[in-house]
Amino acid sequence: MRASLIDGKAIAKKLRDSVKEEVNLRISNGQRVPGLAVILVGCDPASQVYVGSKRKACEEVGFISRSYDLPHTTSEQELLALVSELNNDDSIDGILVQLPLPKNLNADLIIEHINPLKDVDGFHPSNVGKLVLRQPGLRPCTPKGIVTLIESTGIDPKGLDALVIGASNIVGRPMGLELLLAKCTVTTTHRFTKDLEGKVRNADLLVVAVGKPGFIPGEWIKEGAIVIDVGINRLDNGKLVGDVDFGAAKERASFITPVPGGVGPMTVASLIENTLIACQQSSQ
């Protein structure tokens, strides 16, 4: 079996186009356009790239985009004050604080200070809690985007044995909750997990998010499995690769995401969609 590629770029573009249509409809109805504030603290090169893609996506769909590029010396109180200001700004529907933050800043404290109704990253405890209670509000962007990618395959996830490799707060844990909502039977692994190979070989649906190139050998993949590779790793030769051995995995999977061009574009598209949702809810 040779896998079909899940084209994250094409699916993300379709979602962005849909959001753009909604924005144009709001304008024609005399309603305001959504606004997104993006806060970057410090000058981490990877964060600058991610923030740039988010700002570009905002412009493409017609959002108001506010950029706050702060020095790495920014204090916690200064950042909290900016978040408070944006919480009270009616023209801003979404507040995004790019992670990771410098070590002198408490990321949890900052995220909890964002109004949950403007938490378009979906990281606030209130939004994560709603996902746990099967009452999703603003959902974490990467897991939400992955659900859209899975839906694009046309395969009903109900009853599938799903394996999430990696238990981070950003991807792994909320991904498990999303798959439970999709009625999968879910296992989440971490560094203390035993017999990882056996679990991978049994998985109908595999989501890998560990940040280690080629961490999952392709020959472990179950024949016909859906493989979602969240990892994006740059090798010494400059090539970008995922956490799964793509070459071997694509010969066994039924569907697989490429790296790059798979999950990454959907994360940004989901952020844009969340911002529109936040705007629509604030207008009700």
UniProtKB/Swiss-Prot annotation:
Function per UniProt: Catalyzes the oxidation of 5,10-methylenetetrahydrofolate to 5,10-methenyltetrahydrofolate and then the hydrolysis of 5,10-methenyltetrahydrofolate to 10-formyltetrahydrofolate.
Gene3D superfamilies hit by this protein: Leucine Dehydrogenase, chain A, domain 1, NAD(P)-binding Rossmann-like Domain
Description of how the protein assembles with itself and partners: Homodimer.
EC number: 1.5.1.5, 3.5.4.9
Keywords: Amino-acid biosynthesis, Histidine biosynthesis, Hydrolase, Methionine biosynthesis, Multifunctional enzyme, NADP, One-carbon metabolism, Oxidoreductase, Purine biosynthesis
Listed HAMAP family: THF_DHG_CYH (MF_01576)
Source taxon at top rank: Bacteria
Family assignment from sequence similarity: Belongs to the tetrahydrofolate dehydrogenase/cyclohydrolase family.
Organism, as annotated: Colwellia psychrerythraea (strain 34H / ATCC BAA-681) (Vibrio psychroerythus)
Pfam families: THF_DHG_CYH, THF_DHG_CYH_C
Binding residues annotated for NADP(+), in chain numbering: 166-168, 232
Protein name: Bifunctional protein FolD 2
Cellular component GO terms held in the UniProt record: cytosol
Pathway: One-carbon metabolism; tetrahydrofolate interconversion
PANTHER family: C-1-TETRAHYDROFOLATE SYNTHASE, CYTOPLASMIC, C-1-TETRAHYDROFOLATE SYNTHASE, CYTOPLASMIC-RELATED
InterPro entries per the UniProt record, alphabetical: Aminoacid_DH-like_N_sf, NAD(P)-bd_dom_sf, THF_DH/CycHdrlase, THF_DH/CycHdrlase_cat_dom, THF_DH/CycHdrlase_CS, THF_DH/CycHdrlase_NAD-bd_dom
Biological processes, Gene Ontology terms: L-histidine biosynthetic process; methionine biosynthetic process; purine nucleotide biosynthetic process; tetrahydrofolate interconversion
Catalytic activity: (6R)-5,10-methylene-5,6,7,8-tetrahydrofolate + NADP(+) = (6R)-5,10-methenyltetrahydrofolate + NADPH; (6R)-5,10-methenyltetrahydrofolate + H2O = (6R)-10-formyltetrahydrofolate + H(+)
GO molecular function: methenyltetrahydrofolate cyclohydrolase activity; methylenetetrahydrofolate dehydrogenase (NADP+) activity
